[in-house]
């Protein structure tokens, strides 16, 4: 059943994205010929007014067809004044930007609602969960409060900063020789914990985790939710969006670095995560929906054709030059853009396969 809701969420984000383009085009007087979910052969369609609405068979996105999006398109004289390329540059930018804008606004609305309803999550210095089969499973219990790691208490730091230091101390314990997945550190970590009012010193040997790229003990910290007002919830949502935007920009500006290429995920990976998260509860599912919507909006703003950001970029170039960009330049830019989009698609697919099977297309 969770896979069904992953599919529904995916369809919802596509429909809302395309609806942004659709309503903006209508509002600026453009003629919309088609509004379709998915690509490929048509499964179902109906025409209402001048627009055909429908569903196609390949679930890889959706599209809104506006008259005159292609400068070489044959447009009937009676509707030529409503074609895309006959409109002012600002109108074209509004229409193209409306799709990503809807995704970003939706992400903000969901994050705001979740933060306002549930409060701000504050990390605790106590053990929240212990992963089975890990070194921690033999010595730690949920509720144990971590007092010190290797004798280091890191007094004077905030809880978040202290826990980062604890993690760095654990990660400093390395295997003897090459760091491979599952290898055991040559020296143990001394954990001081408070349990039932008593302080105990526990000895545990961390194991290297290939996915995390560091040695881990195998537990997560607990957290509590502190109530917040509407203003604080809005700030939390805005901060989260800003952090994701910075992270997205960093990944795409450093794609030639192996570590950053590994951060790219595709439809398979997102679906797999969605399937797992939905089973964890509504709040986690809503947060995932928000961040996928945000990512969809941000990635579409990349300044490459045929993405929305590419159309915005070349519209701005036209505005600066004072005349349209030649069709030859646009065709070359589109060819390069499609190549980049395909590269990102296969990179994401390779990473997804690697995460699921341990293998990939060896592009990392």
What role is predicted for each listed range?
Residues 44-47, 126-131, 315-332, 361-363:
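Membrane interface segments of multi-pass transport proteins and intramembrane proteases
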Residues 332-352:
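Final/C-terminal transmembrane alpha-helix of multipass membrane proteins
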Residues 109, 113-117, 297, 301, ...:
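Hydrophobic membrane-targeting alpha-helices
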Residues 254-258, 293-307:
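Transmembrane alpha-helix interface/packing and boundary motifs in multi-pass membrane proteins
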Residues 2-78, 299-321:
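Small-residue-rich helix-interface/hinge motifs
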Residues 2, 6, 87-96, 284-288:
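Residue-level signature of transmembrane alpha-helical entry/exit and packing/kink sites
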Residues 10-14, 65, 103, 292-300, ...:
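Alpha-helical transmembrane segments of multi-pass membrane proteins
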Residues 74-90, 98, 102-268, 358-364:
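PDZ peptide-recognition modules
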């Amino acid at each position: 059943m969770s896979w069904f809701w992953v599919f529904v969420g995916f369809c919802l984000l596509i429909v809302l994205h395309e609806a942004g383009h659709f309503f903006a085009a209508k509002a600026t007087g453009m003629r919309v010929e088609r509004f379709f979910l998915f690509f490929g052969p048509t499964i179902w369609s109906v025409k209402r007014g001048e627009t055909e609405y429908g569903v196609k068979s390949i679930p890889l996105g959706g599209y809104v067809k506006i008259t005159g999006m292609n400068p070489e398109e044959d447009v009937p004289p009676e509707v030529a004044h409503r074609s895309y390329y006959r409109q002012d540059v600002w109108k074209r930018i509004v229409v193209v930007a409306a799709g990503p804008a809807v995704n970003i606004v939706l992400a903000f609305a969901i994050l705001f609602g979740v933060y306002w309803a549930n409060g701000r999550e504050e990390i605790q210095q106590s053990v929240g969960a212990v992963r089975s089969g890990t070194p921690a499973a033999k010595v730690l219990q949920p509720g144990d409060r971590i007092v010190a790691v290797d004798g280091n208490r890191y007094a004077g730091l905030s809880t978040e900063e202290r826990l980062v230091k604890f993690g760095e101390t654990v990660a400093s314990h390395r295997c003897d020789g090459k760091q491979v997945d599952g290898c055991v550190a040559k020296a143990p970590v001394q954990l001081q914990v408070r349990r039932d009012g008593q302080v105990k010193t526990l000895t545990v040997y961390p194991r290297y985790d290939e996915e995390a790229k560091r040695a881990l003990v195998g537990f997560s910290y607990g957290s509590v939710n502190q109530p917040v007002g509407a203003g604080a919830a809005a700030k939390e949502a805005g901060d989260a969006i800003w952090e994701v935007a910075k992270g997205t920009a960093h990944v795409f500006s450093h794609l030639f670095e192996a570590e950053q290429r590994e951060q790219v995920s595709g439809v398979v990976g997102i679906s797999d995560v969605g399937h797992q998260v939905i089973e964890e509860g509504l709040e986690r599912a809503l947060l995932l929906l928000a961040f996928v919507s945000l990512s969809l909006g941000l990635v579409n703003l990349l300044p490459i054709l045929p993405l929305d950001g590419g159309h915005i970029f070349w519209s701005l170039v036209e505005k600066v030059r004072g005349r349209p960009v030649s069709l030859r330049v646009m065709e070359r830019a589109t060819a390069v853009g499609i190549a980049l989009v395909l590269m990102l698609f296969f990179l994401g697919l390779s990473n997804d396969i690697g995460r699921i099977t341990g293998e990939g297309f060896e592009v990392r």
